[in-house]
């Protein structure tokens, strides 16, 4: 009798354990074809992936507390970090394990980028909602990832061309990416373009359209950060919008203050 009870309990655990696993909501990890017609009504996990904490005003210490005369508030720190090892299995609202990573040094950064995505899993990845909540409490922007990998890592120029699709003169994915960011409560996107197959002027137009939608909708804080493995600033990209930033290639260094007017900076 006892053996039968143990067997029954084991079977119930397997059945309901599988059901619980099937019901676990996950964060977005998409290819372009899955984003084109995205809406919260058709995405069963959308409501679990929303940040509800507004972006706080960033604290600035008094001038007298500056470390030296060359320290300026205009200089910002962006933390591009792996918040979860695989974007396709990132839980929407935390988990009972230590796989996820949550920064605790918010005072030392101004922007958080979810470093994620792969050719096999997905290349369009919104940041985890709990990470955005935590970032916003400290006035830190939270950016999702759009990753066009190099050919050696499965890069496909067809994804680039699809992302830059125009209909009636408008970049349809710029609009959709804005809708996703607005609904999920984060602050824009990091575009990692290492697949080729496009021009800087095309992406500048894409960025302009994204920010025009955000500005018109009262979300003028939103931004796109650009990376294409270049070690030099791109005037074409940086002049797209006042919020646009660029991640220079690793190891790049130099003083670009003399190019401020060319880069649309003040």
What are these regions (language model features)?
Residues 1, 19-22:
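Basic/polar N-terminal segments that are highly enriched at the extreme N-terminus
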Residues 1-8:
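Bacterial N-terminal signal peptides that target proteins for export
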Residues 8-17:
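Bacterial N-terminal signal peptides
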Residues 13-14, 23-24, 184:
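Compositionally biased, low-complexity repeat tracts
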Residues 17-19, 252:
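Intrinsically disordered low-complexity regions specifically enriched for long asparagine
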Residues 22-96, 100-102, 106, 216:
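N-terminal module-boundary/linker segments of secreted carbohydrate-active enzymes
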Residues 70-263:
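Chitinase-like catalytic core of GlcNAc-active glycosidases
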Residues 266:
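Glycine-rich, aromatic-lined ligand/substrate-binding cores of catalytic
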